[in-house]
């Protein structure tokens, strides 16, 4: 039996994990299964996901007979609704699926407090291939250099998440005591955060698109989550300028 996971925007990492890999919870994984996808030009985080799940998944070409597995569908896409974005069991399924397969080999020295830079986000596959505005910059902090300098002074390590493997990202979120980031796909790894991880999301108070997915994850997994919204929004893509002093005061408050 081969299962085909319904396409749900796999070039965006949140869509890949929650909507598509989350759909695996509908399959009996007590023994190894064959799965396929519409697009077979897999990128790095997709290939790394397959490697972590290689004991239960065998990824095959889609030119065979298959049974379609529906992707996970959002229940609510209204900001501040307080409603579940997807069936919360999806979060617990994914958390157990990956944490049970990731070792502790990554050296977390200097990674206790993290800021995830977003200055390269327009180069990521989803934004690079945006049909309306290819290479669009979304939710970037335009004075990020200033913000990085201030955060480094309080002992925060500033990194580009694109430089790390899926397994390393999972371990960083699981072991760090503080993670600060503009709202981004990388925050899907809050699925694996530890109960001690204080997550601070930076985002304008009037975003142009749905942005409560990480609030939803952290609410159900009982992970500390705060949102810093005292920013100057610059355009319709939620790019912003952040007062680094105000951000530091918020984080330390």
Model-derived segments and spans:
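Beta-rich nucleic-acid/ligand-interaction surfaces
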Residues: 39-46, 166-176
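Active-site-proximal segments of catalytic enzyme domains
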Residues: 136-152, 156-172
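Leloir-type glycosyltransferase catalytic cores
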Residues: 146, 158, 214-253
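Generic beta-sheet signal
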Residues: 38, 202-204, 228
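A donor-sugar binding/catalytic signature common to diverse glycosyltransferases
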Residues: 175-220
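Short loop/turn segments at strand-loop or loop-helix junctions that form parts
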Residues: 2-7, 114-123, 230
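Aromatic- and Gly/Pro-rich donor/ligand-binding loops
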Residues: 1-22
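Hydrophobic alpha-helical positions that pack around
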Residues: 26-30, 36-150, 241-246
């Amino acid at each position: 039996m081969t299962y085909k996971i319904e396409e749900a925007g796999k070039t965006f990492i949140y869509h890949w994990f929650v909507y598509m890999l989350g759909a695996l919870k509908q399959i009996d994984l007590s023994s190894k299964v064959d799965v396929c996808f519409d697009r077979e030009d897999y990128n790095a985080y997709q290939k790394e996901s397959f490697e972590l799940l290689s004991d239960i998944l065998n990824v095959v070409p889609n030119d065979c007979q298959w049974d379609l597995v529906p992707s996970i569908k959002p229940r609510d896409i209204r900001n501040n609704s307080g409603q579940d974005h997807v069936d919360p069991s999806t979060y617990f399924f994914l958390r157990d699926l990956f944490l049970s397969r990731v070792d502790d080999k990554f050296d977390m020295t200097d990674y206790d407090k993290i800021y995830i830079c977003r200055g390269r986000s327009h180069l990521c596959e989803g934004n690079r291939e945006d049909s309306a505005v290819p290479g669009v910059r979304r939710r970037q902090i335009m004075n990020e250099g200033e913000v990085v300098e201030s955060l480094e002074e309080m002992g925060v390590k500033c990194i580009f998440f694109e430089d790390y493997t899926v397994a390393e990202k999972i371990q960083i979120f699981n072991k760090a005591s503080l993670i600060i980031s503009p709202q981004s796909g990388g925050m899907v790894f809050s699925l694996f955060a530890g109960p001690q991880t204080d997550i601070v999301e930076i985002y304008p108070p009037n975003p142009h698109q749905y942005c409560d997915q990480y609030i939803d994850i952290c609410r159900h997994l009982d992970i500390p989550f705060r949102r810093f919204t005292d920013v100057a929004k610059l355009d319709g893509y939620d790019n912003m300028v952040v007062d680094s002093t105000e951000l530091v005061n918020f984080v330390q408050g």
